[in-house]
Design a protein with these regions (language model features):
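Hydrophobic residues within beta-strands of alpha/beta enzymes
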Residues: 20-21, 55-57, 97, 136, ...
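Residue-level preference for long, well-ordered alpha-helices that form the structural scaffold
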Residues: 32, 36-39, 71-78, 110-114, ...
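Active-site acidic/histidine proton-transfer and metal-coordination neighborhood
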Residues: 7, 46-49, 63-164, 174
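Conserved AdoMet
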Residues: 50, 54
Length: 239
């Protein structure tokens, strides 16, 4: 739901859905930062009225808002903004915070330094997440983004045992789901479930693409995951 209108939220609740993820781009994009706060409190009131609980908050992301950028001043600016958004997330009482480790494109010659930058930023933001009682979850991303496979993702969180993974099922373009589950193990803290064609991210409904969902569910259960089965699908997109 791009715009959290009362009617749409009522439909979600009527469909038997109890938990949602609040995507902070709704507050942050195309608006001055000071408007984020009033927007967030309005959404909080709408969710409470609809009887929906917030499982996770997805921190803002864009091409410019990147915690891995080489420029120290810009990186500090971006991480500081994320810290403010984490404080704002506290009004929703989320159990999980989803964070992108980078944007894109990322050139091969920059990849190493940006992995180091992202890991440092993640450690700092993990402290902010802990302050509001939430677990920071780093999302696997497609194409040239950081965290495009389990090896990179585990490297980003290796020094932070309290940080977990947000497993987006339709972002794996270079790795099989079975191998990802084996490599990440019990570090999965939340998921974004959707289907695709393995050519690019699609965010189709499960069953509309190539993912073996019975196998996916078996492996998810075997990993010890006890959280919400969070869908992240695009309305009206099937090709």
């Amino acid at each position: 739901v791009k715009v959290p209108e009362p009617e749409k939220l009522a439909q979600i609740k009527a469909a038997g859905i109890d938990h949602v993820e609040v995507v902070f781009n709704y507050f942050w994009r195309n608006a001055p930062e000071n408007e984020c706060y009033t927007r967030a409190y309005r959404v909080k009131a709408l969710l409470e009225e609809a009887g929906l609980k917030v499982w996770s908050c997805h921190l803002p992301f864009s091409r410019q808002l990147d915690i891995s950028v080489p420029d120290p001043a810009l990186r500090e600016q971006n991480v500081a903004l994320m810290e403010r958004m984490i404080r704002l997330a506290s009004i929703f009482g989320p159990q999980r915070l989803v964070l992108h480790p980078s944007s894109e494109p990322i050139a091969d010659e920059e990849r190493e330094i940006r992995l180091q930058n992202s890991a440092n930023s993640i450690g700092r933001l993990a402290l902010s997440a802990k302050e509001i009682g939430a677990v920071l979850c780093i999302e696997n991303l497609p194409r040239t983004c950081l965290g495009r496979d389990s090896g990179e993702l585990m490297r980003l969180i290796a020094d932070y045992p309290e940080v977990m993974v947000c497993f987006d099922s339709n972002h794996l373009l270079k790795e099989e789901h079975a191998h990802f589950f084996e490599a990440v193990g019990n570090r999965i803290g939340t998921i974004h479930a959707s289907d695709y064609d393995r050519k690019d991210e699609r965010h189709w409904l499960p069953g509309e693409g190539v993912i073996d969902w019975p196998d996916f569910l078996r492996r998810l259960q075997a990993s010890g995951y006890k959280g919400v089965f969070m869908h992240e699908v695009r309305a009206g997109v099937n090709a």
